[in-house]
Amino acid sequence: MKIAVVGSGISGLSAAYYLSKNHHVDLFEKEDHFGGHSHTIDLNFGAKKVSVDIGFIVFNFETYPNLIKFFNENKIEIEKSDMSFSVSVNDSSFEYCGRGLNGIFSNRFNLINFSFLRMFFDIIKFYKKCDNLNEFNEEITLGDYLRKEKVSKEFIEYHLIPMVSAIWSMPPYEANQMPLKFFLKFFQNHGLFRLKNRPQWYTVSNRSRTYVENILSKISGEHFKNYPVTKIKSNSNGIDLYYGGENEFF
């Protein structure tokens, strides 16, 4: 059977990989690179080249069992990663990192800084409550909930919103508009509300493009990038795939 897979993110790559075991599979990607959220870029620092993942970076064994199985099956090498969080604002006058008391109070002035101490206790209180929060108005946003809980400005602007913005690669105003339900489920499932015993995080050795290239090499058909699919039309014998003013039958 001839099959088309549209999109080369982890869903598209894995679908194309498994279907390729018994069928001819062509892969279509609208972007200029394969991998979707898995995207590695190269930066030059003088004579040194550094490869950086700007999308998919980390995973853990607790919440990514199928991804782990997929990587193991394809002998993708992984290594432990540092999943820490730090903030520095106002020319380092307000800064901390989330690893241990020495990191939290890296600026010793914070020991007597009321604004910082309030943020610190808001973190403990908010995390403890949200880790067990299962009943709530599903229509409200994260910003609505933060206003309802009357947490400090410092907690919102120097902790939670920067963290949400970093995780989902979005500006602060969009982080505030995130549905509370989605935020809670993600943080609960990934152990991000835990103040201790958080899961160990891992990353793909030599960056995520190594796994993308590995899987692409095992897909049976052609790989097309810069090919946005504009329409899929089904008929009694299969489908017509439309792209770039052309169409192809599958």
Where are these regions (language model features)?
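N-terminal Rossmann-like FAD-binding beta1-loop-alpha1 element of flavoenzymes
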Residues: 2-27
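Short loop/edge segments at beta-strand edges and connector loops
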Residues: 7, 80-82, 223-227, 233, ...
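Glycine-rich FAD pyrophosphate-binding loop
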Residues: 20-44
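Conserved beta-strand segments of alpha/beta enzyme cores
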Residues: 24, 51, 77, 221-223, ...
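N-terminal glycine-rich dinucleotide-binding loop that anchors FAD/FMN and/or NAD(P) in oxidoreductases
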Residues: 41-67
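Mobile amphipathic helical/loop "lid" adjacent to a hydrophobic cofactor/ligand pocket
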Residues: 61-180, 184-185
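Helical element adjacent to the flavin cofactor pocket in flavoenzyme catalytic cores
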Residues: 185-239
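Core beta-strand elements of the Rossmann-like FAD/NAD(P) dinucleotide-binding domain
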Residues: 244-250
